[in-house]
């Protein structure tokens, strides 16, 4: 399993999706920052999306779609958002339609990732007592040459904030 590399050192790996973002996150101790950054960038930018995994995940999503269909509150909220944000991405159902999902392929996933998962369209957020210079160097190295003309230019928009003491 892909998260074993972090779980072996007491870390945690997870992800979630909203209408505006997909978030991949890891929690690790400071010495394992490099391992977590490497794993997250590998997952985000280098996943291969084998068809059998897509098929399995599509069924999970289709089950979620069915459970939402049994929830009047969810249906009302989705309808409200669709009217409020008509013609915009925020007005679309985040889960999609089961009949369309069942035809989803590896090629579809890779096409989506190439279009949307680029370093110029990503935010790397690190908090904790980790040296900012180390974060910059690590992220620059891990994103060099990935899907954007500015790949590796992480420091351009990066902001380092002072580490607060526990007593602050």
Predicted feature descriptions by range:
Residues 164-168:
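Short, intrinsically disordered, charge-balanced linker/junction segments flanking boundaries
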Residues 2-162:
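Charge-rich, well-structured scaffold segments of protease-associated domains
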């Amino acid at each position: 399993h892909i998260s074993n590399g972090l779980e072996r050192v007491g870390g945690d790996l997870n992800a979630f999706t909203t209408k505006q973002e997909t978030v991949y996150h890891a929690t690790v101790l400071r010495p394992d920052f490099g391992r977590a950054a490497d794993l997250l960038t590998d997952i985000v930018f280098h996943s291969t999306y084998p068809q059998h995994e897509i098929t399995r995940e599509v069924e999970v999503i289709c089950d979620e779609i069915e459970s939402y269909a049994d929830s009047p509150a969810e249906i009302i909220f989705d309808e409200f958002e669709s009217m409020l944000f008509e013609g915009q991405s925020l007005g679309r159902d985040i889960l999609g339609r089961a009949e369309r999902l069942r035809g989803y392929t590896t090629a579809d996933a890779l096409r989506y990732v190439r279009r949307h998962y680029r370093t110029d369209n990503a935010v790397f957020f690190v908090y904790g007592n980790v040296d900012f210079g180390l974060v910059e160097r690590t992220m620059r190295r891990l994103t060099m040459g990935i899907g954007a003309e500015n790949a590796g230019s992480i420091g351009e928009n990066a902001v380092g904030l002072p580490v607060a003491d526990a007593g602050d």
